[in-house]
Design a protein with these regions (language model features):
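N-terminal small-residue-enriched
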Residues: 1-451
């Protein structure tokens, strides 16, 4: 933990000195971002090491603003000569750039002022032998499941990263985070009747991670359950989305309210602010301040303070996801959603987004379904962000009289996200596992195309 704090402090000092040099060299305004990461991962197949990787990187980006002109440059060379050249190049490029009336740093009143400890790093950094043992344990547990005949491997990894940002109007902030992962992919059956499935877990804290054996067992059991699938007749029917795939629906929604898409007019929700887009009672929350969240940070990449927001409240769309530029385009204020790499200007992105749980258990949610589909896998990217049209390959299980029955595959599910959102009902089994999360979800009236 001491090393993490030290690395963050060193990063802040580095970019603060860079900004001073940039303003001294003639820039009207500037900001800088620093990314550092190190990771270690191990992959095994049939008990033997297959992929062993170690990586470290440091990258720095500088944005110079001259009036309403801007330029972004980046470097991995932190020598004084390289940083001097970086400043000169950025200023020269900014002077030659076209004007953009929406370019600029935030108003100082928007800046974050109080750092928040979000508990994103536990200080645990496993070494390669330990990661290999965890990967082997996950794969062995998958292979031990009756019906599993092969493996695509087990994996384990850990990572650590530092992000620092500062601008010339007084903001400087830094944060650090870590992650621990375990995965397994199992194959069941033989010859032409084989099925595969997987399980994957990632946590910022090692103590929150399920055991490798549990992860491997789930992968094996899921693969066996998929054996001998049938095809469905084409029909309209209720569809229940497993949490593993229900998250994608939340992701489509987040993309549709991204300020860049709204400003371009390329979102199917561009005219729906303040209107009912989900059923009454539905809430979708963006929470950048969640402790141990994968996308948690108390400031965005323009230094704007962040806060937990209801994106959807009682089914109504309440806000867009905005950085400063898209906020100016739309005549609104930044919502603190600026994200940024080192070589490009900021753009909006969600943080920890989740669909709030409902009242019913998954079993209760499907109890009245006489004939429906339980989806566990989605294939392809057949989603039109402009119209909301939705068509994706799927696999899962038939629902008969409220119970999950035999496996099905080679089907396509279709609808329009505007209608799907209005007919969406969440179950009560929400778990925070990734940056985008959802419970089991039911949507009535979708079309299933089979044989």
């Amino acid at each position: 933990m001491t090393d993490a704090r030290q690395r963050a402090a060193e990063a802040q000092t580095l970019i603060a000195d860079l900004l001073k040099a940039t303003i001294k060299a003639g820039a009207e305004a500037a900001d800088a971002v620093y990314h550092e990461s190190r990771s270690l991962s191990a992959g095994v197949r049939m008990g033997q090491p297959e992929d062993v990787e170690s990586s470290e990187s440091r990258d720095l980006g500088l944005r110079v603003l001259m009036g309403q002109r801007q330029a972004c440059v980046s470097t991995t060379d932190f020598s004084p000569a390289a940083l001097h050249e970086l400043v000169e190049r950025a200023i020269s490029m900014a002077k030659a750039a076209p004007e953009d009336k929406f370019t600029g740093l935030p108003d100082p009143s928007q800046l974050a002022t109080e750092a928040v400890d979000l508990d994103l790093f536990d200080g645990v950094e496993l070494e390669m032998p330990q990661l290999l043992e965890r990967a082997k344990a996950a794969e062995a547990a998958a292979l031990a499941v009756l019906g599993v005949t092969n493996s695509e491997g087990g994996g384990a990894g850990r990572s650590f990263g530092v992000v620092a940002y500062a601008n010339s109007i007084g903001f400087s902030g830094a944060g650090w985070s870590g992650s621990h992962t375990v995965s397994a992919t199992a194959i069941a059956g033989k010859d032409t009747a084989m099925e595969r499935d997987w399980d994957y877990e990632a946590k910022t804290h090692f103590s929150d991670l399920p055991s490798p054996e549990e992860i491997g067992r789930k992968a094996g059991e899921r693969a066996v359950r998929r054996l001998n699938p049938r095809k469905l007749e084409s029909a309209a029917m209720p569809i229940v989305f497993d949490p593993r795939v229900a998250t994608s629906l939340v992701g489509h929604f987040a993309s549709a309210i991204n300020g860049a898409a709204v400003a371009r007019g390329t979102s199917f929700l561009k005219d729906r602010l303040g209107q009912q887009v989900f059923a009454a009672g539905i809430r979708i929350i963006d929470d950048p301040l969640r402790k141990r969240g994968f996308r948690s940070r108390w400031f965005d990449m323009e230094g704007v303070r962040r806060q937990t927001r209801d994106l959807v409240e009682d089914g109504r769309l309440t806000t867009w996801l905005l950085d400063c530029a898209t906020a100016r385009q739309l005549g609104r204020a930044s919502t603190g959603h600026a994200a940024r790499g080192t070589a490009s200007p900021p753009s909006p992105a969600p943080t920890n987004v989740y669909l709030a749980p409902g009242q019913k258990t998954p079993r209760e949610l499907m109890a009245d379904i006489k004939h429906g589909l339980y989806v566990t896998e989605l294939i392809g990217m057949g989603v039109n962000g402009v119209t909301g049209d939705y068509s994706r390959g799927a696999a899962g299980f038939l629902i008969v009289d409220g119970e999950i029955a035999e496996p099905v595959s080679e089907i396509t599910i279709a609808g329009n996200l505007k209608d799907m959102f209005l007919h969406l009902t969440p179950a009560n089994d929400l778990e925070f596992r990734f940056g985008t999360d959802a419970p089991t979800v039911r949507i009535d009236g979708m079309t299933v195309a089979g044989r």
